[in-house]
UniProtKB/Swiss-Prot annotation:
This is Putative multidrug resistance protein MdtD. PROSITE patterns: MFS. The lineage of its organism: Bacteria, Pseudomonadati, Pseudomonadota, Gammaproteobacteria, Enterobacterales. Belongs to the major facilitator superfamily. TCR/Tet family. One of its GO terms (cellular component) is plasma membrane. Residues 1-11, 70-76, 125-137, 186-196, 246-262, 307-341, 417-430 are periplasmic. It comes from the Bacteria. InterPro entries: EmrB-like (IPR004638), MFS (IPR011701), MFS_dom (IPR020846), MFS_trans_sf (IPR036259), Multi-R_MdtD (IPR023721). Residues 33-48, 98-101, 159-164, 218-224, 284-285, 363-395, 452-471 are cytoplasmic. It is found in: Cell inner membrane. It is a multi-pass membrane protein. One of its GO terms (molecular function) is transmembrane transporter activity. The keyword Aminoacyl-tRNA synthetase does not apply. Gene3D superfamilies: MFS general substrate transporter like domains, Multidrug resistance protein D.
Length: 471
C-alpha cells in the first residue's frame, strides 16, 4: 500500500478509526454492567438490555446501510454514522435511568450499523482491486485490537473512575473522525434501485418485537397477554415478509438464496450457534464480578486470553477445515464449546482461578474456529449474483442471533434467580451454576444442524475457492 496516494492512505485511517470505535464498544460495556446496575439502582438481571438495545438496532439497520451509502454518498453516510455514534455515546454517559440508557444505546446502534459496512464500501471505491485485500487487512486490524483492549479498559475505567467514561472516551475520537471525514473523504455515489421499504419495515418489526417478547416479564415487565401479542405481531410480520419476497426481484433478501443447501444449513447453524456464543461475552464478566467477587478490572483482564485465543486461531482455521471438512469441524467445535463452557463453570466454582485464563484461551480458539467455518460454509456456494445479498443477510442474522443470545442469558438468570442477585447472596453461585448448565445445553444443540452438512472433507475451502474463481 506504500504506492497509494497520501489522500487515500488518510481515508483508510479514517475508516480504521471507525472500525476501532465500533469494535471497542462491543466489548467495553460488558465489564461495566454490574457497576451500571448499582449506579442506576437496577437489578443486574435487567442490564442485558444495555447490550440487546445496541446489537438489535445494528441488526435492524444493517440492510439499509449499503443502499443509503450508494444513494446519499459514502462520505455523507460515514459522517452521519460517526456523529450518531458519538452523540449516542454522550447521551449514554448522561443517562440517569436505565430507559434513558437504552434509548441512547439504540442511537449508538444506528451509527454502528452504518459505520462498518459503509467503511468496507468506501475501501472498495478508493483502492484499486489488486490492493483491496491489503487495504481491508489494514483497516480491520484496529477492529481486532478493540475487543482485546475493551474488557480491560472498561474494567479499568469503572474501577478507577466511573462507568460513564466508557462512553465519554468515544467523544474526542468521534469529533476528530467526523472532521477528518468531511475534509478528506470523497463522496462517492452510485445509481441505486428502489429501496424495498416494505420488506425492510416488515423485517424490522418482526425482529424487534420477537426479541422483546422473548425478554418477557423478567426484563420488560410485560403481562403474559402483552407478550403473546408481541409474539403474534412478530410472527405475522415475518410471514408477511416471506409472502412479500416470493417472486419479488426487488425484495430486500431474495428467497432464491435458500435454494443453495449450504447457505440454508450455514445460515440456520449460524443463527442457532451465535445464540449460544452470544451469551458468553455477556455472562462471563457478570459471573466473575457478581458470582465470584472479582473487581471490574480483574474481570476485564480475565477476558483477554479469550480474545488472544480467537485471534491466534484465525491463522490456521483454513488448514483445519481443509484437513477435516466442514461437517466434522463444525460438529466438533460446537460440542467442544459446550464442554469448555462446562469446564469454565466447574473450575470457577471450585476456586481454581489460576486455571481460568487457560480455559478462556481454549474457549476463544474453539469459538473462532466455529465462527470462521460457519461464515465460509454459508457463503461459499452462492452464485455471484446472490453473493452480496447473502453476505448482507448473514451479517444481519449474526447481529440478531447475538442479541437473542444475550436476551436468553438474562432470561435464564431471571428464571433461576431472585430479583436482586448480589455477591453477598448465598444462592448466587447456585443461580449461576444452573444458568451455565442451561447455556452449555443451548450451545450444543446446533450440532444437530451441522451434522446435516454434506461430508466435504475432499471438497474443502481451497478447492471451493478455485472452482469459483474459474467460473
Amino acid at each position: 500500500m506504500t504506492d497509494l496516494p497520501d489522500s487515500t492512505r488518510w481515508q483508510l485511517w479514517i475508516v480504521a478509526f471507525g472500525f476501532f470505535m465500533q469494535s471497542l464498544d462491543t466489548t467495553i460495556v460488558n465489564t461495566a454492567l454490574p457497576s451500571m446496575a448499582q449506579s442506576l439502582g437496577e437489578s443486574p438481571l435487567h442490564m442485558h438490555m444495555v447490550i440487546v438495545s445496541y446489537v438489535l438496532t445494528v441488526a435492524v439497520m444493517l440492510p439499509a446501510s449499503g443502499w443509503l451509502a450508494d444513494k446519499v454518498g459514502v462520505r455523507n453516510i460515514f459522517f452521519t454514522a460517526i456523529v450518531l455514534f458519538t452523540l449516542g455515546s454522550l447521551f449514554c454517559a448522561l443517562s440517569a435511568t436505565l430507559n434513558e440508557l437504552l434509548l441512547a444505546r439504540a442511537l449508538q446502534g444506528v451509527g454502528g450499523a452504518m459505520m462498518v459496512p459503509v467503511g468496507r464500501l468506501t475501501v472498495m471505491k478508493i483502492v484499486p482491486r489488486e490492493q483491496y485485500m491489503a487495504a481491508m487487512t489494514f483497516v480491520t486490524l484496529p477492529g481486532q485490537v478493540g475487543p482485546l483492549l475493551g474488557p480491560a479498559l472498561g474494567g479499568l475505567l469503572v474501577e478507577y473512575a466511573s462507568w460513564h467514561w466508557i462512553f465519554l472516551i468515544n467523544i474526542p475520537v468521534g469529533i476528530i473522525g467526523a472532521i477528518a471525514t468531511l475534509m478528506l473523504m470523497p463522496n462517492y455515489t452510485m445509481q441505486t434501485r428502489r429501496f424495498d421499504l416494505s420488506g425492510f419495515l416488515l423485517l424490522a418489526v418482526g425482529m424487534a418485537v420477537l426479541t422483546l417478547a422473548l425478554d418477557g416479564s423478567k426484563g420488560t415487565g410485560l403481562s403474559p397477554l402483552a407478550i403473546a401479542g408481541l409474539a403474534a405481531i412478530g410472527v405475522v410480520a415475518l410471514v408477511l415478509y416471506l409472502l412479500h419476497a416470493r417472486n419479488n426481484n426487488r425484495a430486500l433478501f431474495s428467497l432464491k438464496l435458500f435454494r443453495t443447501r449450504t447457505f440454508s444449513l450455514g445460515l440456520a447453524g449460524s443463527f442457532a450457534g451465535r445464540i449460544g456464543s452470544g451469551m458468553l461475552p455477556f455472562m462471563t464478566p457478570v459471573f466473575l464480578q457478581i458470582g465470584l467477587g472479582f473487581s471490574p478490572f480483574h474481570a476485564g483482564l480475565m477476558m483477554i486470553p479469550m480474545v488472544l485465543g480467537s485471534m491466534g486461531m484465525k491463522r490456521i482455521v483454513v488448514q483445519v477445515v481443509n484437513r477435516f471438512g466442514y461437517r466434522r469441524v463444525l460438529v466438533a467445535t460446537t460440542l467442544g464449546l459446550s464442554l469448555v463452557t462446562l469446564l469454565f463453570m466447574t473450575t470457577a466454582l471450585l476456586g481454581w482461578y489460576y486455571v481460568l485464563p487457560f480455559v478462556l484461551f481454549l474457549q476463544g480458539m474453539v469459538n473462532s474456529t466455529r465462527f470462521s467455518s460457519m461464515n465460509t460454509l454459508t457463503l461459499k456456494d452462492l452464485p455471484d449474483n446472490l453473493a452480496s445479498s447473502g453476505n448482507s443477510l448473514l451479517s444481519m442474522i449474526m447481529q440478531l442471533s447475538m442479541s437473542i443470545g444475550v436476551t436468553i442469558a438474562g432470561l435464564l438468570l431471571g428464571l433461576f434467580g431472585s430479583q436482586h442477585v448480589s455477591v453477598d447472596s448465598s444462592t448466587t453461585q447456585t443461580v449461576f451454576m444452573y444458568t451455565w448448565l442451561s447455556m452449555a445445553l443451548i450451545i450444543a444443540l446446533p450440532a444437530f444442524i451441522f451434522a446435516r452438512v454434506p461430508n466435504d472433507t475432499h471438497q474443502n475451502v481451497a478447492i471451493s475457492r478455485r472452482k469459483r474463481s474459474a467460473q
